[in-house]
Amino acid sequence: MGVWNGLYPSQAIFARRRFRRVLLNPPCFDPGSWCGAGKLWIDECDGEYWLTSRPRMGSEKRGYAVEIYRSRNGEDYSLVTWLTKEELSESIGKIVQSIENQQLVRDPLSGKYHLYLSIDIAERNVAGDERRIFESKWETFLLVADDPSGPWKPEGFVLRGDKDYDSGEARDCTIDIVDGRYICLYKARKAGTRVVHTALAVSSDGKNWMKLGIPTVDGEHQPEYFLLNGSIHAGSLGPIFMGTKTLDVVNGAALTRYFASYVIDYRSLNLETIFSAEWKPSSRYEHPQYPIHTYCNVVYDPISDRWLTWIEAVDPILSREPGLNTEVDRVLLYVSE
């Protein structure tokens, strides 16, 4: 796909991306209905593509389940299994108000699949109100299975809000395995504040995590709102993040205008910029000013020798306006060949 050394350049993936199709639609098209916030995992051996998603229907029926889809070509997906927040609440013994981001990886030692869920375990379901989103209590929970189709068994909380900087939110992870090491970039917010940063954690087994803290960006402190979401790849310079860079909150929703890539220097706790550019919509399904609602994946497809990028897109026609309970989100696929 190119003549460059090392990891295929994020600049080329970005420049060559072409809109392919809508992958998933929300459960309905009323404002406040979404799908997405998931993870694309490709099983090269079995020729299968697995995609997770969380459906949402407004402020009261927030992220009410995790859904797992399967495809044979990376473009046409069928629902295989799901787990509701009520079922999850029963299995972990704690009320789950909402499910958001999910991450799906396969553990190299056990061969089991790890499904990480961002769950709101606040005492009351108040964060559906755009004025009260910072009253939520988000942590990350792990489920384990022999196959992505389930059954999924609860393993326990793996990222708790036990640091000052993530006491309000420890969620919305980007988790991948590089050289046998789990690497995680996640959303960290101190309780009682509106300051959101991207934190870094590592693990040898995906269950016991070491939090390294809030990395600098090119040696400087992160902006007051700085959220990364995407994928982590093995590069010649070290682990490489590719995905969205979110700097804005619009009517309670973290909305994205930028695609970026960074070298993750976990030893020096720094993110070194490789590339950053404005994401300009190439489809009629993306809002012209805020095309993406935080979430995306950038994944190499070894089955078809191409790069797949999916985004959770803010629909410009069905949405009343960008915002927590006023927009409609779909999952879109871009292909770089």
What residues fall within each predicted segment?
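Carbohydrate-active catalytic/glycan-binding domains of CAZyme proteins
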Residues: M1-E337
